[in-house]
Amino acid sequence: SAGCARIGFMTRCLYGKDITQADVVFEELGSYPSTYVGQGSNFGFTGGLIGIPAEDPRLKDAVSIAKEQGRKIVFKKASLGFKHPNQARIDVFAADGHKEFSVMTYSIGGGMFQITELDEFQIAIDGSSRQVFICCETSEGIALAEVALERIGAAWSTQRVKNRTLYTVPLTRTQNCDSILALRGQPGISFVRIAEVIMPVARKAV
């Protein structure tokens, strides 16, 4: 369940605030629908989504903690277009019930994971590097984003889906991204989401 917990934790990281409602939708042809309770994936996903790290002993109580806190984490199955046995889409909802965003995820074994889609954009998150994602829906938003990115000397790549442009920006662990986070809520910016490093770092022998 460590991979599932990290998927949930990274999803919460991308959201940038507490998650009160989410659907975890399993690929119906994958292994999750028949194994997620027995293998503890329900505790993993729920714990991560409510902010419990994979290494935290509270993970085993995550489902009851979520219930006590009034959070609604629902498990479903659907056809997602089978790509991996441990494939799940997570839909995050605001308190008023409207969908905020979705991610497509794979738990790949050994506590490792991949997030391959953010809304309809193709991305690559595995928890080992820091990235920020800026989605612009107007030319004004694009101009604001590029000024902020140039200010911190960042490199970036872009992709366009349905009149929206996503900037994918790799960051160093110490790179200050306040000017990028300040884009939230600005005209033409539909979202700014950050992926932090969450995988355990191998300690060097002294």
What do the predicted segments below correspond to?
Residues S64-Y106:
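C-terminal edge-of-domain segments
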